[in-house]
Amino acid sequence: MSNSISSLISVPFQYNYDDGFGDGGGQQSYINIQPVIPFSIGANWNLISRTILPVVNKGDFFPGDDSRTGLGNITQSFFFSPKDPTKNGLIWGVGPALQFPTATNDIAPNQWGAGITGVVLKQTNGWTVGMLANHVWSIGNEDTYGESSKTFLQPFVGYTTKRATSFGINTEAQYDWVAEEWSVPINLTVGQIIKVGGKPVQLTGGVRYWADSPPGGPQDWGARLAVTYLFPKG
């Protein structure tokens, strides 16, 4: 699923694993539950809701750091998107991005956040090329956790065959404006749509390479597995 604002309900469960944190022995695995739900608003526009709820396990970032599991902060994005592509075939959407302080067990700073998000892409002859981006500022608990100002950039290229096999490459780069640090994983994935109980499901697997990360951040290679349940509208 290369088009994150298609008029299709999708519910991905995306597992990720990275290591090399802290002194080199730290690990983190997490499942992103990220439903995408479109709503029609009149004859010409859609409102796309995209939620990301991380369930995280992490540990061994430093000596005596026990493994712990908890929730991360929820990121909620809304895209206002025209139902029809532009004359040049571009599909686009823009809207607000919100962060809810749902983190538990010291998984992440428990802060409210707000900002803006947007996506633009073009699909032709099986290819999808585009960019998703957002910027979120902290708006709460800054006395406890400090200020936060982060930009997320996700350029992506994908190809889907006539047999519904997909190949993709993207980065999920994040720039921390306060710390002045980049995190840049490069992801390579392969997916296949199958039928389970007569319903379409996409299975995806892949690897990532950390081209850049802050001190104490993930290093070298990571892995990704995903199951996406698809619910065509109508």
Per-region residue spans from a language model:
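Transmembrane beta-barrel domains of Gram-negative outer membranes and organellar outer membranes
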Residues: 1-234
